[in-house]
């Protein structure tokens, strides 16, 4: 939003300094600062509210006996609200919303955020210990992976920016002259990567309730 506003002001009135908004580095830095401000101000309020509502992680006794889940008990859950807010608001404010990659990243983030929210909601509000059934979580991850992979593969013109054309070709690490074309298998590869990375964070969060390190990476 701010990107389009700055672009309009720059083209209409041509004030000095507004040309800086066209640089991704500037907008990335501005988005990072915005996210930091949101998390600093909103985070403590949400955490305090969750603690007041006694919304916390429940540790499994059998895992605590094995030395696992020792740090999980009482950790406020639904902290993903802070992460999602700090990601989505700066992205919408500073990113180029005409770029399909940006749109799809926001869609994927919001989609998986809804899956996570449903899981926590069922655990905390509905008092269902297992939350959202595992197969439904996987189904949600595979579903958004198929949407993302298929849209990129079947509509490559939407994802081609300037001289950078979309390609299913990839290079093999440490062998720059060795290329591999995924072809139609690009779609299941997108599904695999999205599901794997999503579950990597989910499993880490399930161990101690502290997934922010993995999310940051």
Q: Can you say where each PLM-predicted feature lies in the sequence?
A:
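"…together with the soluble PPM/PP2C metallo-phosphatase catalytic core" -> "…together
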Residues: 2-217
């Amino acid at each position: 939003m701010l990107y389009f506003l700055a672009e309009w002001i720059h083209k209409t009135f041509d004030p000095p300094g507004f040309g800086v908004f066209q640089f991704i580095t500037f907008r990335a830095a501005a988005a990072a600062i915005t996210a930091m401000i949101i998390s600093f101000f909103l985070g403590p309020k949400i955490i305090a509210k969750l603690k007041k509502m006694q919304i916390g992680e429940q540790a499994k006794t059998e895992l605590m006996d094995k030395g696992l889940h020792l740090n999980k008990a009482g950790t406020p859950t639904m902290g993903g609200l802070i992460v999602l807010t700090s990601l989505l608001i700066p992205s919408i404010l500073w990113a180029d919303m005409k770029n399909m990659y940006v749109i799809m990243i926001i869609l994927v983030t919001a989609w998986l955020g809804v899956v996570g929210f449903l899981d926590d909601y069922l655990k905390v509000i509905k008092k269902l210990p297992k939350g959202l059934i595992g197969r439904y979580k996987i189904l949600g991850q595979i579903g958004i992976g198929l949407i993302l992979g298929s849209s990129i593969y079947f509509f490559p013109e939407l994802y081609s920016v300037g001289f950078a054309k979309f390609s299913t070709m990839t290079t093999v690490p440490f062998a720059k002259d060795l290329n591999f074309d995924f072809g139609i298998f690009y779609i299941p590869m997108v599904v695999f990567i999205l599901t794997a990375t999503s579950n990597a964070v989910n499993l880490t969060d399930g161990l101690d309730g502290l997934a922010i390190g993995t999310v940051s990476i």
